[in-house]
Design a protein with these regions (language model features):
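Bacterial N-terminal signal peptides that target proteins for export
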Residues: 2-13
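Bacterial N-terminal signal peptides
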Residues: 11-22
C-alpha cells in the first residue's frame, strides 16, 4: 500500500493529591517548605500501536495506570533541622517508568537511588521463517523448500510466522555525596544497565560477486553494562581541584549468532562442502565483552585582572580480549590454519588534556582561549588472518586476497584558539575568533589533516524590546597527500601485493575516491536570531542557520553537503487569562555523492561508468496552541496542534556505459498531525481533576519498506515489514 495511515488516540483522567498536606490538619503541619504532589488516574489507549508505544510504553490497547508523584521534605532555612528527603516517580503504570529517591543532611551528606525503564518498539509487522527466535541459534522447519533465489522458496508462505522486534533497557543507578573537613567533598555514582530483546541483523553467506545470499534475522540482545565513577574535590576560595576515576564494563551473554542457510547451493560456493540448505550454516560474532578505565584530574584558579585559568587531564585504557570464534562454523570447509591468537588482545590507551583561559582585563573587553590535546594509541597487535569468506569457501593461502591484516588506527589531535569580544556600544559586542586543529593518524589514507577556522559574531540589545545576534565562520581543512593505495599495502599481505604485476591495479578503492572525514573541505556557516517584544503582550522570534560543506578536491565520494533551517515563533497574551502561540520551522538538507562502477583497472578510469546521487530533504513543521485560565485560575484549559510534513527527493543518474542512464527513486514522504487538549479543575488547594485527549494521525510512504515482501529481492530473504502504522 502506498500510504500507511496512523491514527493514535489516548486519553487520561487523573486526580492530583497533595499527599501529606491533604491528610494533616493545618495546626499539625511542621514549619517546612512542602510542595509535594501525587497524580493518580488512567490512560485509555484506543488501539495497539508500536509507534505510539516507542519509548512511551503505550503500545497496547486498553487502560493503563497513570501514576506520578513528587513528595519530599526540606525544613525552612532557619529551623535548625538539616535533614531533607525527596521521592519522585513518573509513568509508574507504564513500561517507561522512572523513580528516584534522595536523602541527606544538608552540609553533611546525601545519597540517591534511581530506576528507569526505556522500551524500544521497532516493528510488529515483520515476518520470519526461522525457529529459535530469542536464542543464538536459528533453524528452519523440516518443511522448508530451498532455492538459489527467493523466487524458488516454494514453502515460504506456510513457514512464515509473525515477528515483533523490540527490546527493553533497564537502568539502576545510585550515588552519594559526602562533605569532608578542609573544604573537601567526595562524590560517586554507579549504574547497572541491562538491554534485552531483539534487533534486526543481516545474516550473510557468500564470498564475492553475485553469490552472497542474505537473510534478515532477529538477533538476540542480552547486554549488561556496569559503570561507576568517583571523585574527590577540594573547593578553595580561589582554587578548585578534583581527582577522579571511572570504570565501564560491558558484557554480552551471547558470543555469536548461528543460522541455517535457507538457500540451496550457489555457483561460487565451495562444492561438496554442504554450504547450501540443509547442511549449511552461517555464524557471526556479537559485540564482544570489553572494559574502559580512566583516571582524571581537573582544576581552576582565579587570577588578578578578572582572569580564570582552568584545565583537565585524563588517562584511560580500553581493553577487549573476548575469545575469537573459529573461522567458520561449517565443518566441511577446509580451515586448517586457526586464527593467529586466541583473542584480539585489543587495547587503546588514551591521553587527553585541555587548558582554558577566560579573562575580562578591562571594561567591555573579554578574551577566551583554549588548547586541547587528545591522543589515542591503539596497541592492538597486527597479524595475518586467513579468514573464511561468509562460511562459503575453503581457506585460502597467504598470497590470496583473503589473507588480511588488521589496521589498529591511532590518532593524535592538537587544537587551540581564541575568541575576543569588545562591547563598543552599550549592550553591543563584536567578537572575532580563530581555531586551529591538527590531527595525525596511522593506517589511513591521509597522515595529517589541518583545519583553520575563522569566526565572527555580533550580539546586540540596542533597545529594551529588541535583541539580535548574528554569527559566521569559515573553516578550511586540508590534508597531506591522499595515499589511495594505503588500504591495499596496509591491509593485505606482501605476498598478495607482490602478485599484482600491473601497477595500475595497485588499489582497493577507486584512486579518485575520497573519504569525507579525511578529504579537503571548505565549511561556511552563518546563523542568527532576532527577538522582539514591541508590546508587553507580544513576543516574536526569528532565527535561521545555514551550513555548507564543499569537498572541492573530491572527484568521487561526498562532494557537497548543505543544511538550511529557519524558524519564526510568536507568543501573544491579549488578556491576562489567555496565552496563545504559533510557530513554523523549515529545514532543508542536501547532499551530492559521485561514484564509479568498475571491476578492473580499465573501468576504474572510465568516466562513462560514473554515477551520481542527489538527495534533498524538505521538512515543514508548524504548531499553534493556547492556554486559558478561568474562575480565578481554578479552571485551566490547554490545546496544542502540531503539523509536520517531510519529503525526501532522491535523484540518480549514470554515464553512457551504464544502464539506466537516468532514474529517480520515488519520494519518501510522511505527514503527521498531532492534537492535544486538556482541562484541569482545582477543586481546592490540594485537590484537582484533569482530563486530556491526544489524537495523532500519521501517513507515510517509503518505497524501500512498503511493498517489499520477504521474497521481493532475489538474493535477500527479507522481513516483509511495513512502515509503522495503526488503523482505527
Amino acid at each position: 500500500m502506498a500510504h500507511e495511515r496512523v491514527v493514535r488516540c489516548a486519553s487520561g483522567a487523573l486526580v492530583a493529591l497533595a499527599g501529606l498536606v491533604a491528610v494533616l490538619p493545618a495546626a499539625a503541619l511542621p514549619p517546612e517548605e512542602n510542595q509535594s504532589w501525587v497524580e493518580l488516574g488512567a490512560w485509555v489507549n484506543s488501539d495497539d500501536s508500536y509507534k505510539f508505544g516507542d519509548f512511551t510504553g503505550l503500545e497496547e490497547k486498553g487502560i493503563s495506570l497513570l501514576a506520578n508523584f513528587d513528595v519530599g521534605r526540606r525544613a525552612v532555612w532557619d529551623s535548625g533541622d538539616v535533614r531533607w528527603w525527596r521521592a519522585q516517580g513518573q509513568n509508574l503504570g507504564l513500561d517507561s517508568r522512572w523513580a528516584r529517591g534522595d536523602f541527606g543532611y544538608q552540609g553533611l551528606f546525601d545519597v540517591w537511588f534511581e530506576y528507569e525503564e526505556i522500551p524500544k518498539f521497532q516493528t510488529d509487522s515483520a515476518i520470519t521463517v526461522f525457529q529459535g527466535r530469542g536464542t543464538d541459534r536459528l533453524t528452519l522447519r523440516p518443511s522448508w523448500v530451498a532455492s538459489s533465489t527467493t523466487a524458488g522458496f516454494g514453502a515460504l508462505a506456510e513457514n512464515e510466522r509473525d515477528l515483533d522486534i523490540e527490546h527493553m533497557r533497564r537502568d539502576v543507578r545510585a550515588g552519594f555525596g559526602l562533605d569532608l573537613p578542609a573544604d573537601l567533598e567526595w562524590v560517586g555514582d554507579y549504574e547497572y544497565e541491562t538491554k534485552k530483546g531483539l534487533k534486526v541483523a543481516a545474516a550473510l553467506i557468500g564470498n564475492t560477486g553475485g553469490n552472497p545470499r542474505t537473510s534478515l534475522v532477529a538477533e538476540p540482545l542480552d547486554y549488561q553494562t556496569n559503570e561507576g565513577q568517583t571523585a574527590l574535590r577540594w573547593n578553595g576560595e580561589r582554587v578548585q581541584l578534583q581527582l577522579g576515576y571511572e570504570i565501564s564494563v560491558f558484557n554480552d551473554s551471547n558470543d555469536s549468532l548461528t543460522w541455517q542457510n535457507p538457500f540451496s547451493q550457489v555457483g561460487g560456493w565451495q562444492a561438496g562442502a554442504g554450504v547450501g540448505y540443509p547442511t549449511g550454516f552461517g555464524r557471526k560474532a556479537t559485540p564482544p565483552d570489553n572494559s574502559f578505565n580512566q583516571v582524571s584530574m581537573a582544576g581552576g584558579v582565579d587570577l588578578p585582572w578578572n582572569t580564570r585559568i582552568s584545565g583537565d587531564a585524563a588517562f584511560g585504557w580500553m581493553r577487549q580480549n573476548a575469545d575469537f570464534l573459529p573461522y567458520t562454523v561449517n565443518p566441511l570447509l577446509d580451515a586448517a590454519v586457526p586464527p593467529p591468537r586466541g583473542d584480539a588482545d585489543a587495547g587503546i590507551d588514551t591521553t587527553a588534556a585541555t587548558l582554558r583561559l577566560a579573562s575580562r582585563p578591562i571594561d567591555h573587553l573579554r578574551i577566551d582561549a583554549n588548547v586541547r590535546y587528545d591522543d589515542r594509541d591503539n596497541t592492538t597487535p597486527r597479524d595475518v588472518y586467513l579468514y573464511v569468506s561468509g562460511d562459503s569457501l575453503d581457506q585460502q593461502g597467504i598470497g590470496s586476497d583473503r589473507a588480511r591484516l588488521n589496521l589498529p588506527n591511532s590518532y593524535q589531535l592538537v587544537e587551540g584558539g581564541f575568541e575576543a569580544g569588545y562591547e563598543f556600544f552599550e549592550r553591543t559586542e563584536l567578537s572575532v575568533g580563530y581555531q586551529r586543529q591538527e590531527i595525525e593518524r596511522t593506517y589511513t589514507e591521509v597522515d595529517q589533516t589541518t583545519e583553520n577556522t575563522y569566526e565572527a559574531a555580533l550580539r546586540s540589545r540596542p533597545l529594551s524590546w529588541l535583541q539580535a545576534r548574528v554569527e559566521g565562520s569559515y573553516a578550511d581543512r586540508n590534508g597531506t597527500e591522499y595515499m589511495y593505495r594505503s588500504p591495499l599495502f596496509g591491509g593485505f599481505t606482501p605476498e598478495y601485493v607482490g602478485s599484482i604485476t600491473d601497477p595500475d591495479e595497485l588499489f582497493e578503492n577507486n584512486p579518485l575516491l575520497r573519504k569525507n572525514n579525511f578529504a579537503d573541505r571548505k565549511r561556511s556557516r552563518v546563523l542568527g536570531r532576532i527577538d522582539l517584544m514591541p508590546i508587553d503582550a507580544l513576543s516574536i522570534g526569528l532565527d535561521g542557520a545555514w551550513v555548507d560543506d564543499d569537498y572541492d578536491q573530491s572527484t568521487l565520494g561526498l562532494t557537497q553537503r548543505e543544511a538550511l533551517s529557519s524558524t519564526i515563533d510568536l507568543s501573544w497574551t491579549p488578556i491576562e487569562i489567555l496565552t496563545t502561540y504559533v510557530w513554523f520551522t523549515y529545514e532543508n538538507l542536501k547532499s551530492d555523492v559521485d561514484g564509479r562502477s568498475f571491476s578492473n583497472a580499465a573501468q576504474a578510469s572510465d568516466p562513462e561508468r560514473d554515477w551520481f546521487e542527489r538527495d534533498e530533504d524538505h521538512v515543514y513543521t508548524a504548531g499553534v496552541g493556547a492556554e486559558l485560565h478561568l474562575f480565578d485560575d481554578r479552571l485551566r484549559l490547554r490545546a496544542d496542534y502540531v503539523y509536520s510534513m517531510a519529503n525526501t527527493d532522491i535523484e540518480v543518474g549514470t554515464g553512457e556505459a551504464l544502464t539506466p542512464t537516468s532514474r529517480n527513486f520515488p519520494d519518501v514522504e510522511s505527514r503527521l498531525h498531532d492534537f492535544n487538549v486538556s482541562a484541569e479543575y482545582q477543586f481546592r488547594e490540594n485537590l484537582a481533576f484533569r482530563v486530556s485527549y491526544l489524537l495523532e494521525d500519521l501517513k507515510s510512504d517509503d518505497w524501500a519498506i512498503n511493498g517489499v515482501a520477504p521474497d521481493t529481492i532475489s538474493q535477500v530473504l527479507g522481513l516483509g515489514e511495513d512502515t509503522p502504522h495503526y488503523r482505527n
